[in-house]
From Swiss-Prot:
The chain crosses the membrane at residues 8-28. One of its GO terms (cellular component) is endoplasmic reticulum. It comes from Danio rerio. One of its GO terms (molecular function) is metal ion binding. The keyword Ligase does not apply. This is Alpha-1,3-mannosyl-glycoprotein 4-beta-N-acetylglucosaminyltransferase B. GO terms for biological process: protein glycosylation; protein N-linked glycosylation. It is a single-pass type II membrane protein. N-glycosylated. The keyword Nuclease does not apply. Residues 36-83 form a coiled coil. It is found in: Golgi apparatus membrane. Keywords: Coiled coil, Glycoprotein, Glycosyltransferase, Golgi apparatus, Membrane, Metal-binding, Signal-anchor, Transferase, Transmembrane, Transmembrane helix. Its main location: Golgi.
Length: 547
């Protein structure tokens, strides 16, 4: 019995050992299988990555081959272009234009371009690139001043002109302006000598971006030998005026992207003080954007301001007729086309053109040259409005609506006086009459100045007339400015309709500072308190904005 039990235990022990051994073996086998699977997956992933890298390498290799082919093609095309240019130069301008029309576009419609008017420009790639190009490429300014300059036989006025223009600019104005000198000569040696002289005289202005110097390519101008004589002008004068038209076109094309306004000048002028801000504000104060030319001199093409947006139209019109008429006639024709009705008379046409061409007085630029750019011509042109004692004085005032109860005499309106174009003239004022200036947006005003009467009618003054303001924030201004000191005594008198009296006319003039505590003003008013024995002239209005 005992033996049987021992045998049973032995068998049981061996069975357990076998079972444990089998479990260990199974576990070991499974563990080994998992490791193999992991390595197998990693090798497969590595193979995929290597394959992807190989494909990417092939792609890059193809791209590099394409780039190399493009470089080879460009070199070949450049060589072919040289050969084509040699052939092209032997073709007539008419043939060149026809070929350009065929090859320039796949469109059915052929768009007009500068090459239709100047087909010779197709002969050289550099024909529209400046030969001399000095400057910082400043853009985004308010005004670009264009100064074309040509070689004169006797005397050059260019450096004196530039000195005058720059001297009359304030530091802030110099940051808001570009002066472009266009040396309108294809003689490269002469152009370089002028440019070098300007670099020596005005290094700071060039470095700052205020002054730029350009000259045309030797291939820019067409052959002038076949021009037709017209309007009684000899061939040399026809050539001179034709080239001058192209000079203006080149300068305008260069300047049009640099600023908001472009002013055409000449190289033999002097400028009045404050000319830049006067021009800028006169342009901004125009009641309409319909104007095309603002004139700051009555002479020729001096001091003519254009909107930069209008320059492409003007250039294209000039290019169409550059051989036919001088620039001043062409500008008049543009305005005729825009506003004149052929069924109306000449007076109606003149009235319509007057809305496009607006004159500022007094003139801001004076012509000083006596030796014309046309060889042998002596001209003693002077602007009679420059430096002349005028019957009014204009200022750049804040944008506003001006109204009055006074009866205006003829065309001497209050609006013209406020814009600085003329004086205001009205019949005899009576008590209760007013002149009101209502600002389009509230304005902080530092000081005011009103002058009545002028040199021809010194007695036509305002008498017993007060200056009144209407603050935008009436409640706050009353708290801060209407009371003075601890006794709270009135500092200013308030009218029934809310205006505050701050000054009055004495000997025909009212001037003074505006209390800063008033804040922005909504309006300013001149109020007549008693009947006047005479008519009234308002010859100067100046509302100075606070900085």
């Amino acid at each position: 019995m005992r033996l049987r039990n021992g045998t049973f235990l032995t068998v049981l022990l061996f069975g357990l050992c076998g079972l444990i051994s089998l479990s260990w073996y199974t576990a070991f086998s499974n563990s080994k299988g998992n490791v193999v699977d992991i390595y197998q997956r990693e090798f497969l992933a590595l193979r995929d990555r290597l394959h992807s890298a190989e494909q990417e390498n092939l792609k890059r290799s193809k791209e590099l081959n394409l780039v190399l082919d493009e470089i080879k093609r460009a070199i070949a095309e450049k060589q072919a272009l040289r050969d084509i240019n040699r052939t092209w130069s032997s073709l007539s301008d008419e043939t060149k234009l026809k070929l350009w029309n065929v090859t320039s576009s796949k469109n059915v419609l052929q768009l007009p371009s500068i090459f239709h008017h100047l087909p010779h420009l197709l002969a050289k790639e550099s024909s529209l690139q400046p030969a001399v190009h000095i400057g910082q490429g400043r853009t985004g300014v308010s005004i670009v001043l264009g100064v074309p300059s040509v070689k004169r036989e006797v005397h050059s006025y260019l450096t004196d002109t530039l000195s005058s223009l720059m001297t009359e600019l304030s530091p802030a104005e110099k940051e808001d302006c570009v002066i472009v000198v266009f040396i309108a000569e294809t003689d490269q040696q002469y152009a370089n000598s002028v440019a070098d002289n300007l670099k020596r005289l005005f290094p700071g202005e060039i470095q700052s971006g205020l002054l730029e110097i350009i000259s045309p390519s030797v291939h820019f101008y067409p052959d002038f030998s076949h021009l037709k004589e017209s309007f009684g002008d000899p061939k040399e004068r026809v050539r001179w005026r034709t080239k001058q038209n192209l000079d203006y076109c080149f300068l305008m094309m260069y300047a049009q992207t640099k600023g908001n306004y472009y002013v055409q000048l000449e190289d033999d002028i002097v400028a009045r003080p404050n000319y830049f801000t006067t021009m800028k504000n006169f342009a901004l104060q125009q009641p309409s954007e319909e104007w095309m030319i603002l004139e700051f001199s009555q002479l020729g093409f001096i001091g003519k301001m254009f909107k930069s947006l209008d320059l492409p139209l003007i250039v294209e019109f000039m290019l169409m007729f550059y051989k036919d008429k001088p620039i001043d006639w062409l500008l008049d024709h543009i305005m005729w086309v825009k506003v004149c009705n052929p069924e109306k008379d000449a007076k109606h046409c003149d009235r319509q053109k007057a809305n496009l061409r607006i004159r500022f007085k007094p003139s801001l630029f004076q012509h000083v040259g006596t030796h014309s750019s046309l060889a042998g011509k002596i001209q003693k042109l002077k602007d009679k409005d420059f430096g002349k004692q005028t019957l009014h004085k204009g200022h750049a005032n804040p944008l506003a609506e001006v109204t009055t109860s006074l009866k205006t005499y003829q065309h001497f309106t209050l609006e013209k006086a406020y814009l600085g174009e003329d004086f205001f003239w009205a019949f005899t004022p009576v008590a209760g009459d007013f002149i009101r200036i209502r600002f389009f947006t509230p304005v902080r005003v530092e000081r005011y100045f009103f002058r009545s009467g002028n040199i021809e009618h010194p007695g036509d003054k305002l008498f017993n007339t007060t200056v009144e303001v209407l603050p935008f924030d009436n409640i706050q201004s009353e708290k801060e400015a209407l009371k003075e000191g601890r006794e709270k005594t009135p500092k200013y008198q308030r009218t029934e309709d809310g205006f505050i009296r701050i000054g009055k006319f004495e000997n025909g003039i009212a001037e003074g500072e505006v209390d800063a505590s008033f804040g922005p003003l909504e309006a300013l008013r001149l109020s007549v308190l008693t009947d006047s024995p005479v008519w009234v002239i308002l010859s100067e209005i100046f509302i100075k904005k606070a900085e």
